[in-house]
Curated annotation (Swiss-Prot):
Residues 19-26 are annotated as: G1. This is Elongation factor Tu. Residues 174-176 are annotated as: G5. It catalyses: GTP + H2O = GDP + phosphate + H(+). GTP hydrolase that promotes the GTP-dependent binding of aminoacyl-tRNA to the A-site of ribosomes during protein biosynthesis. Monomer. Keywords: Cytoplasm, Elongation factor, GTP-binding, Hydrolase, Magnesium, Metal-binding, Nucleotide-binding, Protein biosynthesis. The gene is tuf. It comes from Nitrobacter winogradskyi (strain ATCC 25391 / DSM 10237 / CIP 104748 / NCIMB 11846 / Nb-255). It is an enzyme of class 3 (hydrolase). It comes from the Bacteria. Its main location: cytoplasm. InterPro entries: EF-Tu_GTP-bd (IPR041709), EF-Tu_GTPase (IPR050055), EFTu-like_2 (IPR004161), EFTU_2 (IPR033720), G_TR_CS (IPR031157), P-loop_NTPase (IPR027417), Small_GTP-bd (IPR005225), T_Tr_GTP-bd_dom (IPR000795). GTP binds at residues 19-26, 81-85, 136-139.
């Protein structure tokens, strides 16, 4: 069978299901594909197809993730679902499957559980912009007051982690009812209502090309008679010939002008997100720029040395450390294109971090790096990856 052509005529959005084990994340994912397939916006993917998620490697970490795609009348969605809790932790921290929004699945019969809390906290730490809640298994709860109680608990928990708990849409239903066609109101109708809420409540992400220009420096050359050329892949935005840019990170921020952009040895008038380019910089000496800095739109990114992060530490089996580490641990932090040494400060009450743990920590780098919230990094020891992290907030 020929692969259906992917029509990009609708805005695209990346979402995922999160929540406690056995609350029905995978069943809901299957139910969404089933209900939308009837409207011609998806291919039904059964539970057992989603559940045997293939393993992927992201930043040297093995993660099992299932991907399904579907569309509503308004949007095209790529949806990720993970089989195990550890896969969620790794996925969210590495950003392997980027989430523009999440569907939090909570069993009405059990209410919020430890991983419900942990996934909400992770969503906050890694900067998931919006959450919609599906209260699942409502066919197992006869008492409407009990349902209200669970809903209140979920809203309080979301507010505790700085999500707008009072405003978040909560849809009551049953993924199983949708899959078995047993109760239209709790099944199919609830799933359609959920997708309406996801369409309306999860904001459309800004495309990389519309964001302010940023390009990590990979290499620097000096071309006699022309000046200094900096190469790299444009991460976001557009850079036009003649524009003023800043060189940020590692040393004092410098301003310069892009006097040429080339790609595949051809001169262009601009480079944009996704392009591998060489940028010719006016009056910049070869020794003024180095790998690990970024070129960016003036004022858009600042260099920082101190930040709070959420990190996942690899297990021995994943090729990570064999032993725990303590506060004042000094590994390298690999941001975009370079390693920078930093010192780890563990939160009060955390004695040590074991391989396989995820942890909130504070990091002090020895030189400043261009960074902002949500920036991903690897933690390395002598070139070997021992962890992955994401900038949760900047201190200075």
């Amino acid at each position: 069978m020929a692969k259906a052509k992917f029509e990009r005529n609708k805005p695209h959005c990346n979402i995922g299901t999160i929540g406690h084990v056995d609350h029905g994340k995978t069943s809901l994912t299957a139910a969404i594909t089933k209900v939308l397939a009837e409207a011609g916006g998806a291919t039904f993917t059964a539970y057992d197809q989603i559940d045997k998620a293939p393993e992927e490697k992201a930043r040297g970490i093995t993660i099992s993730t299932s991907h399904v795609e579907y569309e509503t009348p308004n949007r095209h969605y790529a949806h990720v679902d993970c089989p195990g809790h550890a896969d969620y932790v790794k996925n969210m921290i590495t950003g392997a499957a980027q989430m523009d929004g999440a569907i939090l699945v909570v069993s009405a019969a059990d209410g919020p559980m430890p991983q419900t809390r942990e996934h909400i906290l992770l969503a906050r730490q890694v900067g998931v912009p919006a959450i919609v809640v599906f209260l699942n298994k409502c066919d197992m709860v006869d008492d409407p007051e009990l349902l209200e109680l669970v809903e209140m608990e979920v809203r309080e928990l979301l507010s505790k982690y700085e999500f707008p708990g009072d405003d978040i849409p909560i849809i009551k239903g049953s993924a199983l009812a949708a899959l078995e066609d047993s109760d239209a109101k709790l099944g199919k109708e609830a799933v359609l209502e959920l997708m309406k809420a996801v369409d309306a409540y999860i904001p459309q992400p800004e495309r990389p090309v519309d964001q302010p220009f940023l390009m990590p420096v990979e290499d620097v050359f000096s071309i006699s008679g022309r000046g200094t050329v900096v190469t790299g892949r444009v991460e976001r935005g557009i850079v036009k010939v003649g524009e003023e840019i800043e060189i940020v990170g590692i040393r004092e921020t410098q301003k310069t002008t892009v006097t040429g952009v080339e790609m595949f040895r051809k001169l262009l008038d601009q480079g944009q997100a996704g392009d591998n380019i060489g940028a010719l910089l006016r009056g910049t000496k070869r020794e003024d720029v180095e790998r690990g800095q970024v070129l960016c739109k003036p004022g858009s990114v600042k260099p920082h040395t101190k930040f709070k992060a959420e990190a996942y530490i690899l297990t021995k089996e994943e090729g990570g450390r064999h032993t725990p580490f303590f506060t004042n641990y000094r590994p390298q932090f690999y941001f975009r294109t370079t390693d920078v040494t930093g010192v780890v400060h563990l939160p009060a009450g955390t004695e040590m971090v074991m391989p396989g743990d995820n942890v909130a920590m504070e990091v002090h780098l020895i030189v400043p790096i261009a960074m902002e919230e949500k920036l991903r990094f690897a933690i390395r020891e002598g070139g070997r990856t021992v962890g992955a992290g994401v900038v949760a907030s900047i201190i200075e």
